[in-house]
C-alpha cells in the first residue's frame, strides 16, 4: 500500500470514530432529556414515594397505642395528680375508694389480703397502717383507754356478702347510706378499719372522744365525719378510720374537711 493510500485510510478511520462518538453523545443526551421530561410530567410518583417513605419511617419510630396499659396518668380539673393503677385511682398518691371511685375485684390490699377481719396483727392492712395504729393504741393505753381493730381488710367478695345481707332487711337506697357496695368499700383498700364496738355509741365513749381528737397525730382521719354526710355519701361513723399520713391527716383535721373535700372529688354512685 502506497503512502498516499495509508493517509487516506487513517483519515477515514478518524472520521468513523468521530461519527460514532458523536452518535453516542447524542443518544445519551436524548435519553437524559426523555427521563427528565417523564418525571416532570408525572410528579405524583415522586410525591407518593415521599409519602410512603415518611409513613414507613413514622411507623417504625412511633410506638403503637397500647390500650392494655396498667397505669395511666392525667391531671384533674382541680390540679391534683391522678393515677389509675390496676383499676384503682390514686389522687396525689392517696388511694381513693368511695361511691365514685371503685377498686377492682382483684385488688387485695397488702400481701394478698388474706381473709380475716380480726387478726393479730391485722392481715391485709399495709405495714405503715399497722405501725401507726400500734403506736396510737399504746398511747391510748397509757391514758387508760382501750382501742382495738374490730374489722380490718375485707375482700371484694366479703363485702359483697355484707352488702347483700343488709339488703335482706333494708332497701338498697337505705343500705347505701351505711354500707358500701362491693368494690366501693374502703375496707378493701388496706388503709381503713373499724374500731371497738362499730356503732354510734363509740362516739360518746372516752375512747371515741380521744380518737376523734388525736388520731390525726398518727396519720388517721375519721373517714365519715359528722356534718359531711352529703359529701361522703355515708352516715357519720366515729369508729371508721382511714390512714392518709400525718401531714394530710393533720391538714384535714385542722380545716374540718373530709377526704372528698381535700382531694376535690365527689362520692356518688353512677346508678
Give the predicted meaning of each segment.
Residues 2-152, 156-271:
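Extracytoplasmic cell-surface/polysaccharide-interacting catalytic and binding patches
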Amino acid at each position: 500500500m502506497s503512502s498516499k493510500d495509508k493517509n487516506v485510510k487513517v483519515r477515514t478511520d478518524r472520521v468513523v470514530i468521530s461519527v460514532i462518538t458523536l452518535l453516542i453523545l447524542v443518544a445519551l443526551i436524548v435519553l437524559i432529556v426523555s427521563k427528565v421530561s417523564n418525571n416532570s410530567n408525572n410528579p405524583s410518583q415522586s410525591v407518593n414515594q415521599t409519602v410512603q417513605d415518611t409513613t414507613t419511617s413514622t411507623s417504625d419510630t412511633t410506638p403503637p397505642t397500647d390500650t392494655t396499659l396498667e397505669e395511666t396518668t392525667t391531671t384533674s380539673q382541680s390540679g391534683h395528680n391522678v393515677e389509675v393503677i390496676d383499676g384503682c385511682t390514686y389522687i396525689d398518691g392517696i388511694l381513693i375508694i368511695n361511691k365514685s371511685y371503685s377498686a377492682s375485684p382483684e385488688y387485695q390490699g397488702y400481701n394478698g389480703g388474706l381473709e380475716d377481719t380480726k387478726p393479730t396483727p391485722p392481715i391485709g392492712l399495709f405495714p405503715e397502717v399497722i405501725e401507726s395504729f400500734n403506736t396510737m393504741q399504746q398511747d391510748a393505753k397509757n391514758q387508760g383507754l382501750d382501742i382495738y381493730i374490730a374489722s380490718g381488710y375485707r375482700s371484694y367478695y366479703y363485702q359483697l356478702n355484707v352488702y347483700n345481707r343488709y339488703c335482706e332487711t333494708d332497701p338498697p337506697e337505705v343500705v347505701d347510706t351505711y354500707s358500701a357496695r362491693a368494690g366501693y368499700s374502703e375496707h378493701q383498700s388496706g388503709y381503713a378499719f373499724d374500731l371497738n364496738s362499730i356503732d354510734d355509741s363509740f362516739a360518746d365513749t372516752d375512747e371515741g372522744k380521744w380518737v376523734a381528737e388525736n388520731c390525726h397525730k398518727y396519720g388517721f382521719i375519721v373517714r365519715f365525719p359528722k356534718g359531711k354526710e352529703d359529701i361522703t355519701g355515708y352516715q357519720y361513723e366515729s369508729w371508721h378510720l382511714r390512714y392518709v399520713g400525718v401531714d394530710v391527716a393533720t391538714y384535714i383535721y385542722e380545716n374540718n374537711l373530709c377526704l372528698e373535700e381535700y382531694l376535690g372529688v365527689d362520692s356518688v354512685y353512677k346508678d
